[in-house]
Amino acid sequence: MAEGTAEAPLENGGGGDSGAGALERGVAPIKRQYLTTKEQFHQFLEAKGQEKTCRETEVGDPAGNELAEPEAKRIRLEDGQTADGQTEEAAEPGEQLQTQKRARGQNKGRPHVKPTNYDKNRLCPSLIQESAAKCFFGDRCRFLHDVGRYLETKPADLGPRCVLFETFGRCPYGVTCRFAGAHLRPEGQNLVQEELAARGTQPPSIRNGLDKALQQQLRKREVRFERAEQALRRFSQGPTPAAAVPEGTAAEGAPRQENCGAQQVPAGPGTSTPPSSPVRTCGPLTDEDVVRLRPCEKKRLDIRGKLYLAPLTTCGNLPFRRICKRFGADVTCGEMAVCTNLLQGQMSEWALLKRHQCEDIFGVQLEGAFPDTMTKCAELLSRTVEVDFVDINVGCPIDLVYKKGGGCALMNRSTKFQQIVRGMNQVLDVPLTVKIRTGVQERVNLAHRLLPELRDWGVALVTLHGRSREQRYTKLADWQYIEECVQAASPMPLFGNGDILSFEDANRAMQTGVTGIMIARGALLKPWLFTEIKEQRHWDISSSERLDILRDFTNYGLEHWGSDTQGVEKTRRFLLEWLSFLCRYVPVGLLERLPQRINERPPYYLGRDYLETLMASQKAADWIRISEMLLGPVPPSFAFLPKHKANAYK
């Protein structure tokens, strides 16, 4: 999994019970006048919340009880004490072992956010799209065709303004839009703003979608992978000499001696010049399917010194990447996509490959454990999507991926790893990059031995996260080891990743000699970090400015996922997941010492206004309250528990 799958947000309840007294080690140094206790913090929000809203329910479930995390994820409050109050000496051996487990990873078994109250009365897509033809599904259609009946059961609008209608002149979701009052006539007909339509305003260009015909071919296994099968046959015939395998594409700044002379292709029978044909051609006839591109013919990846937004699972969606691009991110990468799911034509997996027009340097990240599926997937992507590079995820730490041989496990499977890299390099026409960790075990580093091999296999660029799989986020990233790896990887470019939350952190990272830096959790805590690094300053951003960023995210989300009920709730879900990271940011004006460090837990504090205090809350109920400011009230049966749980401060 990518960097963003970190056990990111704090546990519900916030940072420790430190009052206005002395700060503990590992606690953010906030000015004394802003410090408070846990009880006073929540009393303040409850009192102000009652003044600002008439809603009585301030927690995640309709009964008003805060959603508890699964039993396996709870941790003891005090050292030496078990969950049931016994001391470790008095506890049974089995109980003692259970309490020693660190809280990490995902909140498994959490309730799904998918609403179900509208699934029973869904309007037919033919009516939504105002199709003049008959129903798309014919007599087998199970959807409603009575617009009046649908409007009777449809939930109330969430607001008076529709972003899609105001931006593009027409809302494609028609009567199903949750803001339909802005563009719907009383009889249910969708309005169109003629001025915007006359100017030809269209929604932003989003590329790399999955064609329906290709999806059917993938599901029926009718797609041929000649180039991938040819590469796999070479592996089955035995080890290939290094000189006979193309070295791939090197990034700019990595000098290589490449033979760019003409490649000799053995001539077979019947290779004489064919007679001219009276049939006209519709374009140039290439031989890319027969003759592989030489290394010097491939596109090059020149991102030296640029700011690279990490491929963040769950939170690194397209609307979030648009936010980061606006603040100065140079390179973006899609969320981790599983190669087997892509080969099966799963729409949810192909959605991770979508690219917005503002992403000028964009790549996709693949995860897989076997050369055949990874090579075939690389060939498929080279024919169907527009990307600047393809990244292999060798840093995913979760058990689901690791136990199948993918992610970090590839660092210990050098033969399979080599076949994956060489096979993908042979079928791709764009550079191939790799993201790795320092190793699998906490005190056993592997990266310095693996980097020279990756360079020889033809990898264009490597990103090194300065932590091992077992370490996760309980300790700081090892930038001293990253500096050693820079020398081992030379002349191959190496990007560093880990614990960058300020421009000072970025400057220290660049002093290690890395080609550039990748930013992951820092971008989730404050996406304006890219601006701070480029302008070399601390930005004391106000709460209203932060709310405007969230409003832009919701607008981008409605454009991307839709303004109907399903799209609104999907936007809300990803907003809440992001808020579980944003709440850990401490405003610059409240800190005694700059900058904020990523491993320092924010204590309970009262901000300079109500909104700043609300944004500092670690309770999911308060995140929901913020979402209601932007997307209206939640459904009656709404429940939310963050996907990831933090142990970064332990």
Curated annotation (Swiss-Prot):
Needed co-factor(s): FMN
Active site as annotated: 396 (proton donor)
InterPro entries assigned: Aldolase_TIM, DUS-like_FMN-bd, tRNA_hU_synthase_CS, Znf_CCCH
EC number: 1.3.1.89, 1.3.1.-
Any GO molecular function: mRNA dihydrouridine synthase activity
Residues found modified as Phosphoserine: 236, 276-277
Keyword list, A-Z: Acetylation, Flavoprotein, FMN, Isopeptide bond, Metal-binding, mRNA processing, NAD, NADP, Oxidoreductase, Phosphoprotein, Repeat, tRNA processing, Ubl conjugation, Zinc, Zinc-finger
Positions with biased composition (Basic residues): 101-113
Cross-link (Glycyl lysine isopeptide (Lys-Gly) (interchain with G-Cter in SUMO2)): 416
Chain intervals for the UniProt region annotation (Disordered): 1-24, 46-120, 235-284
Positions annotated to bind FMN: 311-313, 365, 435, 465, 497-499, 520-521
Zn finger (C3H1-type) location: 118-148, 156-186
First-level EC class: oxidoreductase
Extent of Basic and acidic residues compositional bias: 48-58, 70-79
Catalytic activity: 5,6-dihydrouridine(47) in tRNA + NAD(+) = uridine(47) in tRNA + NADH + H(+); 5,6-dihydrouridine(47) in tRNA + NADP(+) = uridine(47) in tRNA + NADPH + H(+); a 5,6-dihydrouridine in mRNA + NAD(+) = a uridine in mRNA + NADH + H(+); a 5,6-dihydrouridine in mRNA + NADP(+) = a uridine in mRNA + NADPH + H(+)
Positions of post-translational Phosphothreonine modification: 273
Top-level taxon in the UniProt lineage: Eukaryota
PANTHER family for the chain: TRNA-DIHYDROURIDINE(47) SYNTHASE [NAD(P)(+)]-LIKE (PTHR45846:SF1)
Family (UniProt): Belongs to the Dus family. Dus3 subfamily.
Known function: Catalyzes the synthesis of dihydrouridine, a modified base, in various RNAs, such as tRNAs, mRNAs and some long non-coding RNAs (lncRNAs). Mainly modifies the uridine in position 47 (U47) in the D-loop of most cytoplasmic tRNAs. Also able to mediate the formation of dihydrouridine in some mRNAs, thereby regulating their translation.
Protein's UniProt name: tRNA-dihydrouridine(47) synthase [NAD(P)(+)]-like
Organism: Homo sapiens (Human)
Record gene name: DUS3L
